[in-house]
Design a protein with these regions (language model features):
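Metal-dependent phosphohydrolase cores
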Residues: 9, 13-206
Length: 206
């Protein structure tokens, strides 16, 4: 019971800390840069964190993910790049292992199918429960994956993975993954509404 309350308290505290950090980043225009990265307007490859992941990112196994649609408007490649960057920024801010967080972020969805087209057979786990383990297996076949990175990958869908994340960095990706997915789904919609508003404003002015 004590462990449960400690874990719940830790999660609530981490949520508050990440929320505060994202608010600070927003005020510093950093989140706007990340939204641009989601839409490929910002060359994320020129950012400092790229040195931590370049060997993984440039591999053919990762580049293949650019052909697979993910979260409606983007690709798996773009998504994992976004997650890797947010992992790096947040973990670096809190003094966690930002390098491993970034590298694991780039491997956390290492699977080669469109989740919307996947046929679930009787007895198989759902995509949400299955793909973290598959991604970890695929990553270990190609890259050197540390115990920390492995835990980040297999636990990134917690609580759907049931077992508690073992490291602080593993909790970070739980929230970062969802946050990036939200950005990826909402950003194109926001841009569409913004463009429509600007168009209407121009027409009204004329």
């Amino acid at each position: 019971m004590t462990d449960y309350f400690f874990t719940r308290f830790s999660l609530d505290l981490l949520c508050c800390m990440i929320y505060n950090l994202l608010w600070k980043l927003y005020n510093n225009n950093e989140v706007l840069k990340m939204i641009s990265a989601v839409g490929s307007k910002k060359n994320i490859l020129e950012l400092p964190f790229y040195n931590c992941i370049s060997d993984i990112f440039e591999s053919k196994e990762i580049q293949k993910l650019g052909d697979i649609t993910h979260h409606i408007y983007t690709t798996i490649l773009q998504h994992i790049l976004n997650v890797a960057y947010y992992n790096y920024i947040i973990c670096n801010f809190f003094g966690f292992n930002a390098v491993s967080a970034a590298r694991a972020g780039l491997m956390h969805d290492l699977f080669y199918y469109n989740r919307k087209e996947r046929v679930k057979h009787k007895g198989e786990k759902s995509h949400c429960a299955h793909h973290p383990v598959l991604a970890a297996e695929n990553a270990r076949e190609v890259f050197d994956v540390s115990l920390l990175e492995h835990d980040i990958i297999v636990k990134h869908m917690w609580p759907m993975t049931f077992k508690l994340p073992k490291y602080k960095e593993s909790y970070v990706i739980v929230f970062v993954d969802k946050y990036c997915a939200l950005l990826e789904v909402m950003s194109p919609k926001y841009q569409k509404i913004k463009n429509r508003f600007i168009k209407n404003k121009v027409q009204t002015a004329v």
